Amino acid sequence: MPGYDTSLFTGDFDYHDIVEEKYYAIKFDTMQQKGKEAIDMSKYKAVIDSGTSIIVGPSSLVNQLTDGISVNRFCKGIEDLPDITFTFDGKDFTLTYEDYVLQVTEGDITECELAIMGSNFGPFFDYMIFGDTFMRKYYSHFDVANSRVGFALAKH
């Protein structure tokens, strides 16, 4: 038993070494909104966390990444939102609006909210946390024995 369900993803895993054992933290190169300049994230680590619902990072960086991305409460125009790409250890992982906008339907009403949030963790916090928003698109394999985490495109 390999520790993962092959019916839940396509392709092979792209593995990334854990750079900090305290968390599942991997090397973080850049993040970029399509059509804008890449943001250098080399001083930060990407934490892959199944216990976090969204993507959370330092407010100043999240504000820079999401500049110009406006999510209307009633989802108007979300299909025009740009892709966002995160680069971990030289490998790109792209999210579309379908990945980073939460759509919640209750009765006949669907409401939308951005699933990337800024938080002021403090001056010594050098992480960005990638929770379910990221992991819904990229099936994640936590390979504890080899101190690495792998990603493959999830099936839905």
Predicted regions and their residues:
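Active-site or ligand-binding cleft "flap/edge" segments
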Residues: 1-156
